[in-house]
Design a protein with these regions (language model features):
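Conserved alpha/beta catalytic core and glycan-binding cleft of carbohydrate-active enzymes
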Residues: 6-188, 194, 226-272, 276-286
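Solvent-exposed beta-strand/loop surfaces of large extracellular or lumenal domains
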Residues: 287-293
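Short acidic catalytic loops
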Residues: 1
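Catalytic cores of secreted or luminal carbohydrate-active enzymes
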Residues: 196-201, 206-229
Length: 293
């Protein structure tokens, strides 16, 4: 575009009006053609906030030739509601809409956070949820309500993102185990310091800290999604959105997902519509003691 793509694409024509930089599209199309001709195994990903139609269609079919685009609205949304709304104000219908707002022809990479959140100037989701408590209350023996809430939401946000947000999933530099701090590369503004130009991967293997529980949840979540080929199955199917109880039920492939976003209520014997009658087995729960409860 001749702009940054942060406009209201309220009709199809907005993707093809005079705001479109046609020279840039030709260049990107030729670049994708060259890359895939030279390296058929290569994957190219568009960092495009608009979700332009045709961006992930082959050039021979009139598209730009990217394999995927980044679902940039998803991490922006999570940070927005964490910054601006209390738990009681979360709109579960809005969550569903943002997660599933993509064109079927544009294969989307879903992710909960990336450099916009992790680099200096913002906070990772884990740090925004738990802040200074992460420095002294991440020991497994500690009991801390801020950490318990933060870990619960961190797991739910990642699970919701991978289950509904796209056709691929991206972890980013330690968010799979809730890395606490930001990334800051050496520059004049920090006196060329390397102090934050790192990720402390040892946190995820330290058996005394809760980071390993968040990491174990991530591995279990990805195993479940890969085993059931959820990301190859298009869109999830919504069965229930209970605004009063802040609960959601949806299916994807042969999995049924039930989310309770309510900050205080745990509803016993909850009744919800399901795709088909029968017995269901519990494959994954964020409440598992292995994942920090």
């Amino acid at each position: 575009y001749h702009h940054h793509g942060y406009v209201e694409f309220d009709c199809r024509e907005r993707f093809f009006d005079e705001g479109v930089n046609r020279d840039a599209i030709v260049y990107l199309t030729l670049a994708n053609k060259l890359i895939h001709d030279l390296r058929p195994d290569a994957i190219t990903i568009a960092e495009d906030v608009s979700g332009m139609p045709g961006s992930c269609v082959k050039p021979e079919e009139g598209g730009m030739g990217f394999d995927y685009r980044l679902g940039m609205a998803i991490p922006d949304y999570w940070i927005k509601i964490l910054k601006e709304k209390s738990d009681e104000e979360w709109n579960i219908w809005e969550i569903w809409t943002v997660m599933t707002n993509r064109l079927p022809s544009v294969k989307t990479v879903a992710y909960a956070e990336s450099h916009d959140q992790a680099l200096v100037g913002d906070k990772t989701i884990a740090f925004r949820l738990m802040d200074k408590e992460m420095y002294f209350a991440m020991n497994r023996a500690s009991e801390n309500l801020v950490v318990e809430r933060g870990m619960a939401l961190h797991k739910m946000i990642r699970l919701m993102t991978i289950a509904t947000g796209g056709d691929a999933y991206l972890n980013f530099m330690g968010n799979e185990f809730g890395h606490p701090e930001w990334i800051d590369f050496p520059r004049e503004g920090n006196n060329w310091s390397y102090a934050h130009a790192q990720r402390l991967w040892s946190l995820s293997t330290n058996g005394f800290l809760r980071y390993s529980q968040l990491g174990e949840f991530d591995r279990a979540m990805i195993r479940l999604v890969k085993r059931n080929r959820v990301l190859q199955n298009g869109y999830p199917w919504r069965w229930n959105t209970d605004y009063d109880n802040k609960s959601q039920t949806f299916s994807h492939k042969n999995l049924l997902f039930i989310f309770n976003w309510h900050p205080t209520a745990s509803i016993a014997d909850y009744i919800t519509e399901v795709p088909r009658p029968g017995k269901y087995t519990l494959e994954l729960t964020t409440d598992d003691i292995r994942f920090g409860g």
